[in-house]
């Protein structure tokens, strides 16, 4: 099952530093997800100045419980980078200029 995550970073004065400090662990954690095909697409949400203020994630898990289990281990969650996360079921239609089944 595919999911769309829209995750907003905190807006406190330490938010940017928290993201920077945790970013390496975040990428180490998502690398196996990419290799297993669970992470279909992802990237940072930017403000008008080009600063990272959140993330968009298109992920594929067998069910919502498995997605929730991943979030309990995701460094951006455990270290307080993402403060507000919207999660919606999603069906990917186009990826890299190709229509997906």
Go through the PLM ranges and name each one.
Residues 1-101:
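Conserved, structured core segments of small domains
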């Amino acid at each position: 099952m595919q999911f769309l995550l829209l995750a907003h970073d905190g807006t406190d004065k330490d938010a940017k530093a928290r993201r920077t400090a945790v970013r390496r662990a975040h990428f180490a954690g998502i690398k196996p997800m990419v290799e297993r095909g669970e992470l279909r697409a992802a990237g940072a949400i930017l403000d008008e100045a080009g600063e990272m203020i959140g993330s968009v994630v298109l992920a594929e898990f067998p069910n919502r419980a498995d997605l929730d289990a991943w979030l309990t281990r995701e460094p951006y969650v455990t270290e307080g980078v993402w403060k507000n996360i919207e999660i919606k079921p999603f069906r990917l239609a186009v990826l890299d200029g190709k229509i997906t089944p």
